[in-house]
Amino acid sequence: MTDIKIDQTLDTLGLRCPEPVMLTRKTIRNMAEGEVLLIVADDPATTRDIPSFCEFMDHQLLNSETENTPYRYWVKKGL
């Protein structure tokens, strides 16, 4: 685990592509710049999709744990 301060948590366990990224986008849209979203997922596609989403949308992927499920991603909202 990490010491990153989490502002919101999004549980996408049991959901499959494209739902985890769609819910991430919807959730982060309502957050303030600089806030951190913890995404919990078990869809293997998120190991590719969440980092790509962050890069495309100018959010910062602070950390990820993808060795075992559930996967965890800490995303800091950009502009």
From Swiss-Prot:
Keyword line: Cytoplasm
One term under GO cellular component: cytoplasm
Compartment(s) of residence: Cytoplasm
Active site, per annotation: C17 (cysteine persulfide intermediate)
PANTHER family named among the record's database cross-references: SULFUR CARRIER PROTEIN TUSA (PTHR33279:SF2), SULFUR CARRIER PROTEIN YEDF-RELATED (PTHR33279)
Annotated function: Sulfur carrier protein which probably makes part of a sulfur-relay system.
Record's protein name: Sulfur carrier protein TusA
